[in-house]
Amino acid sequence: MYKSYSMELAGRTLTVDIGRVAKQANGAALMHYGDTTVLSTATASKEPREGIDFFPLSVEYEEKMYAVGKIPGGFNKREGKASEHAILTSRVIDRPMRPLFPKDYRNDVTLVNMVMSVDPECNPEIPAMLGSSIATCISDIPFDGPCATTQVGLIDGEFVINPSLAQKELSDLQLTVASTREKVIMIEAGANEVPEDTMIEAIYKAHDVNQEIIRFIDKIVAECGKEKHLYASCAVPEELFEAIKKIVPPEEMEEAVFTDDKQTREENIREITARLQDAFADNEEWLAVLGEAVYQYQKKTVRKMILKDHKRPDGRQITQIRPLAAEVDIIPRVHGSAMFTRGQTQICTMTTLAPLSEAQRIDGLDEFETSKRYMHHYNFPSYSVGETKPSRGPGRREIGHGALAERALVPVLPSAEEFPYAIRTVSETFESNGSTSQASICASTMSLMAAGVPIRKPVAGISCGLVTGATDDDYIVLTDIQGLEDFFGDMDFKVAGTHDGITAIQMDIKIHGLTRQIVEEAIRRTKEAREYILTEVMEKCIAAPRDHVNKYAPKIVHIQIDPQKIGDVVGQRGKTINAIIERTGVQIDITDEGAVSICGVDQHGMDEAKKMIKTIATDFEAGQIFEGTVVSIKEFGAFVEFAPGKEGMVHISKISDHRINRVEDVLTLGDKVKVICMGKDKMGRMSFSIKDVPEEA
């Protein structure tokens, strides 16, 4: 049965159509926000997937180019693999939804959000996020929703709810907040050094709007929701836990996990698991879930140690940061490099500088984002965690971590006018034991400074964790979580920023939300830790950006030419400019306004290219002197090339002070000669003279 529901959201109408399309999906909602249209669907497999110990949720955000009236590029003119923006949006949708599914649910669930029309005033991410929640809530898939999502901007000191694409370009804050009925469940932000108090206020502005949306969703679910289907739980039998405790008492498990060395801990757990496998060799049912049982036993042990005893697995205090180290210039010949180590997490970041023409082109649905000059790429090889696995390129996690570090650093980068380079940083994970994304922010900051990029301020990142008890007041916030505390804890709250404010936030949780008290404490903790990392480690390693780029980095010079001369510089089919590039070894970019960028490593080549371009772009006058090459000899004279593709003729009578019968008696092909411009001949060609060049020239 088709029903339509509407509400006013941030001055625009949000309309949800139920039962109109995609009726064979478990749940579907056709979302309209202004003229933006997104189809959100939720489907689940009939049976659980065998042999897995995780919930198989897949979230897709599909950008259709017809939504903005474009035909996709490429040979086959079809949408290809998901763009980076689509992947990041999928992750933002996934993170608040995942904790609300049953932890022991093993049926495959797929959420698909298809962007069908884009109104620049209404960001399609909003209806996609809300549509996923609505489609799942009205379906028969087990789900403890709803959740709602709102975006907040900050323009001229005023908060803007669900800013348009144009407003986002002006905003000092791009914040996305998801909430359940009472608590915040997901935060994602990029900011221009927004103070902590302002950030908290913005988070709860969004949370208040989310409560209105949840009441709207409740009405839809009450009228259209299906009864949730029953499923076979894969929970570990309590009898198995009791049997394990008899073989491995709690004190032994505590001793196994209580070490500051990740590999020692993993070896301890392997030994315990092997003993249990031998003990339960005759019980196939228990063996099938033994891995999950040991995991749960570890988890309960670690959480009890932290929550009741305030004892962390590596012996640190609750607010203590792991040992830190920082170095720069560790890799030769790259344009900049730095390594940042935090405990058993180690990141090395390399910086590469290139002309602005190397900026990444973006062909997406956002008409305001067509390119970006700063790119941060994050790599996580299997050896960083002591595993062997083939490398298959960056996955969604790597793309997400790279984007987080990129977002954290963009606010402190110099403008293209101040520093006319495209910039790429690559963070290589050498070792991982938690918080590699935040370590990559620290390493990237120092690498940029070592490369001579004049960033305004250094940026550091830190992550806080959480362990909760039975009540909202029973919790412990942990500063600088390691891998084990992330796996067994309830939160990964990443915050990056400068001394003066926040530049990026990403919060993931595994429970049904955080109270305001926890959010405020986590943000306060990360500020204290960030100050320590910046002051005591990073700024002691490199205090300020170097005042020059690395000797191996390209240099860039700019000149301005008359826009009407661009065609002369480029030449027919690029012949002239390509000849300059080939001859001098530089890279040349010219804008429609006549701004010319010359980029190269060799200063002599850059000077030559600059001289050639200026020569070509000059209006020639009689009396100008050039140095050129004899490129052609005729009976009546010689042709001299004074710039790539530009020639003038020296008549035989203008070659020498005395009479000559043959040009070849004086000149040969390839001779370098100085000529003086005599004007233009009857055919409009440049007329040169060799004999009239002053001796002092």
Predicted regions and their residues:
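Extended amphipathic alpha-helical scaffolds
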Residues: M1-S45, D53, H229-E369, P554-D568, ...
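Conserved phosphate/anionic-ligand binding catalytic regions in large, soluble enzymes, centered on
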Residues: G27-A29, C122-I141, V328-T351, N433-V453, ...
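Glycine-rich, flexible beta-strand/loop modules in the N-terminal catalytic cores of phosphate-handling
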Residues: A25-V109, V115-S117, C122, E188, ...
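Single-stranded RNA-binding regions, centering on S1/OB-family and related RNA-binding modules
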Residues: L290, Y552-H558, P563-A697
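Flexible, glycine/charged-enriched surface loops at secondary-structure junctions
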Residues: K103-V109, D144-P146, I213-Y231, Q263, ...
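Flexible glycine-/small-residue-rich
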Residues: Y33, A42-A44, Y61-E63, N113-S117, ...
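Long, basic N-terminal domains or extensions that often function
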Residues: M1-A232
